[in-house]
Structures are given as C-alpha cells and as structure tokens.
C-alpha cells in the first residue's frame, strides 16, 4: 500500500526529461522517468487518489466534501461513494487519517476513536479502540495499521501524560529516540513497542527539528522508514514479531539544502528562525520487484526563498515551481544505480505503484493554472 506539491519551458518538458550527468560510479546506467499513460476521471473539483488495492483492482479516493470517499475501478470509473457520518450511533468525530485499502476493505484511523474497517458499501465490519488516552503530534501517511503476527502495529502515538508544560519541548525531547511502532494484541490489549529509532538521524542531534513525519513502506518482511527533511532512509527486517534495524541507505546527494535545527530553549522561535529554510527531502519511496525508486527534491536556496511572498497564493505557487524533483534508483539490495534523474514538473505524487511498475501522479491544476474538464492523473514509469 501507499502514502504532495509541486515556468513552463516547452510542453514536451513535462513529458520527457533528459538525464543529468552522474558520478562515474553509476554512469553506466541511463534511466529516464517519463509519462507513459494517463487516467482521466469524470469528477468536478478536487479528487485525491489515496491508495490502490491489487486484490480488488480498486482505487480509494477522497472527494471535495469533508468525509466523501470513493472507490474507483482501475479505469477511474466510480464503483461506490461513501460519506462517513458525523452524527448518529455510527458517527465518526474528527479527521480520518490515515486511510487506505487492504484486501477489498477500507482501513482507517480516527483520533481517540481507534481503528476501523469498512466494506465498499459503507458497512462497518471491524473496530478497535486503543485502551489508553493518546494523541498524534501531526498528520500521518502510510497505512493505518500493519498486521504483525496475531497483533496489529501502527505508528506509536503519544500518551497524554507526556505533556508537562505549555510548550511542546517536553514532547519532542521524548519523541526523538523512541521506537516508531506500537504493537497491540487486540484480544488481550497487551501492548509493546518495536522498530527502534534509526541511528544517525538529524533528529538525534540534540536540537529541536519539529516533527519527523515518519513514513513507513512495508513489503513482506522488509520495512522502510524515512523522515521529513532527511536525504536518506532506513531498512528494517521483521523477525519473530519484531521489526529490527538493518541498514541506512543514502541518496548520495551532496548539493541539497540542509535543514536548520534550533536549540530546545529556542523552540518557540523555530518558525521565525527557519522561515527561509527549504531543505531537501524525500517525497515518496516505491518498492518494486527488483528496484527501489525514491522521489526527492533538493530544496530551495535561501536567497530565492526570501524573494517570494508566501502570504499570497501566487507566491506559494512560485515556491513549488522552484522545487525540482528527481528520482534515485536502487537495485533490490539497496545499491544506488543512478540519482538526480529529473522528474516532469507540475505533478503531485501519490503513494501508488501499480503492478505494471507505473507510478500515479496528479496533474497539479494550480501549477499549470488551468481548469480541466476532468481530474487528470499521469502514469509514470522508469525507462532504460
């Protein structure tokens, strides 16, 4: 399963990108990342495709309305529309996040209500409420839950009792270094933690770096973890119900803008001190059969960021246009084959990699400043 933003030169530049010279260690490869097909969905407004389920060959999408979700077939035709209730005996209060598909069922989390499974007709078929008070510091991406033996695993939430003052300092000093996953036996309600915090992360440097936005990609017994503003990721292996650290993998990108951390005593000034700091970051990671593809950008130089008025919509669009996205390609053993492969501009990448090796990305209407009759998703593929 799964997991947003993005000038014009020539129209062709959106569909085919030439390669940048790479180091001699990987110069024997000649990959390109190109649009090979598209998906046009007859829908008025914004429609975000969240996930694809190979067992049912269906997409899950979020529509315009707050709780409007749709199940689409692989051609983009609507199979069913669901609107989760906000009142009544089956009311769901609060944001639904994260949400995805697994084996023909919709799985999601609602803060302080727990985890849910629904069928495509909107019928609730399973619910589990955590046996303690908790919260998440910010939004999540990835799957809502991960089966782990007879238990379920999910990104570890914070207990309410960790809040010791009015600032978030105490929370983050405790978060940095803690295991990533919580594991719960839903019968006995017995819990434990696994997936140790990765070594050599910038979030372990003793500074305040805000929330890590941990994102997990699971493929069989292999788990991949990456954080916001890190140009590397970590691989874990599942064994005996534990998710153990295996290795760190670098994108080997030396010219990315570095993130700025601040001392914890200056935490309240973080936004002001980092106002013009737009560091490089990983946007998505895709695990194919014999390769790993990583979408990333290198950030925006401070001198350019200072020139943009972020209070205006046009300024925010300009910032996105300044971000050039790239692909890094690794083999199945995480050896880097090629990096800095340019990505067509104006796309918002989903977490979806199809069985045909195609990555789904939304054509960003604000980027192109156009009004289309359809919601357009492009299918991109690594070509050699």
Describe each model-derived feature in a short phrase:
Residues 21-46, 335-340:
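A short helix->beta-strand "capping" segment at the edge of beta-propeller domains
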Residues 37-67, 283-287, 291-297, 301-304:
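Beta-strand-rich domains and repeat architectures in extracellular enzymes and scaffolds
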Residues 46-54, 96-102, 142-149, 211-219, ...:
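Structural signature of eukaryotic scaffold interfaces centered on beta-propeller domains
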Residues 77-112, 126-138, 343-347:
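Blade-loop segments of beta-propeller domains
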Residues 113, 120-170:
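Asp-box/WD-like beta-propeller blade repeats and closely related beta-sheet repeat scaffolds
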Residues 136-138, 249-267, 335-355:
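Conserved blade-ending motifs and adjacent loop-strand segments that build the rim/top face
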Residues 156-175, 297-321, 364-377:
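Short, conserved, GDST-rich strand-edge loop motifs in beta-rich repeat architectures
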Residues 169-188, 235, 312-333, 374-384:
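Beta-propeller blade signature
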């Amino acid at each position: 399963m799964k997991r947003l933003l993005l000038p014009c030169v020539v129209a062709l530049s959106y569909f085919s990108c030439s390669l940048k010279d790479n180091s001699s260690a990987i110069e024997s490869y000649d990959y390109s990342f190109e649009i090979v097909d598209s998906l046009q969905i007859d829908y008025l407004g914004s429609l975000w495709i969240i996930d694809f389920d190979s067992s049912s060959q269906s997409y899950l999408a979020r529509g315009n309305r707050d709780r409007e979700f749709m199940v689409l077939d692989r051609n983009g035709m609507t199979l069913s529309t669901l609107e989760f209730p906000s009142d009544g005996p089956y009311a769901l209060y609060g944001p639904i996040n994260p949400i995805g598909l697994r084996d023909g069922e919709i799985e999601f989390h609602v803060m302080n209500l727990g985890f849910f499974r629904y069928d495509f007709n909107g019928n609730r078929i399973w619910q589990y409420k955590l046996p303690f008070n908790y919260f998440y510091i910010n939004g999540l991406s990835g799957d809502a839950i991960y089966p782990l033996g007879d238990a379920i695993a999910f990104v570890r939430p914070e207990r309410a009792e960790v809040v010791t003052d009015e600032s978030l300092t105490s929370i983050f000093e405790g978060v940095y270094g803690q295991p990533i996953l919580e594991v719960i036996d839903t019968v006995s309600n017995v819990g434990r933690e696994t997936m140790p915090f990765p070594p050599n992360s910038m979030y372990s440097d003793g500074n305040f770096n805000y929330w890590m936005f941990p994102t997990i990609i699971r493929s069989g017994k292999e788990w991949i973890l990456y954080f916001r503003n890190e140009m590397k990721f970590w691989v874990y292996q599942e064994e005996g119900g534990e998710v153990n650290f295996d290795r760190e993998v670098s994108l080997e990108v030396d010219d990315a803008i570095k993130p700025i951390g601040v001392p914890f005593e200056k935490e309240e000034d973080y936004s002001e001190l980092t106002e013009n700091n737009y560091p490089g970051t990983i946007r998505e990671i895709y695990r194919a059969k014999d390769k790993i593809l990583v979408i990333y950008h290198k950030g925006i130089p401070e001198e350019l960021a200072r020139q943009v008025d972020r209070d205006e919509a046009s300024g925010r669009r300009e910032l996105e246009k300044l971000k050039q996205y790239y692909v890094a390609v690794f083999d199945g053993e995480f050896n880097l084959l090629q990096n800095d492969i340019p990505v067509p501009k104006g796309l918002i990448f989903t977490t979806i990699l199809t069985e045909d090796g195609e990555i789904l990305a939304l054509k960003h209407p604000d980027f192109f400043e156009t009004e289309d009759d359809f919601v357009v998703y492009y299918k991109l593929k690594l070509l050699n």
